Amino acid sequence: MDLPPEQLEKYLEQLKNNRADVVIGSKMHKDSELDYPLVRRIISFGYYSMLKILFHLNVKDTQTGIKMFRAEALKSIIGLVKTKGFAYDIEILVALNCRKYRIMEMPVKLVFGRENGMGRIKLKDILQVFSDTWKIFWRANVRKDYRKL
């Protein structure tokens, strides 16, 4: 995926104006401009729906990859993050959400540059993300690892 870096200025402005502790790019934002395959849109929508149910995240898209954090927010949870791979940023957002940090979604301009519609993601990657998601659910909702001490 191509995410033009000039988008970052608007994200930084939201952090500077104290409107958010975390600003993330969202393909689901109404003002996003997307060149994105239908199969990926369907898979993404299903996964985001699952995340909303499991974690009560007030965001529609966790996986776009463009994110900005206030240093103090990220420092407060980074030692708690155990996940590697594609679900890493989900765990970060869940941990921040558990600690009541403000997460704001911003539109993205995205050009999908892969021909087959799936890019580098393989079935084993998808299965690993689901496995990691359940581990994050366990840490967040059963063990309550991300709550403030």
List each language-model region with its residue ranges.
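DNA-recognition element of transcription regulators
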Residues: I90
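Secondary-structure boundary/capping motif
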Residues: R70-A73, Y101-R102, I136
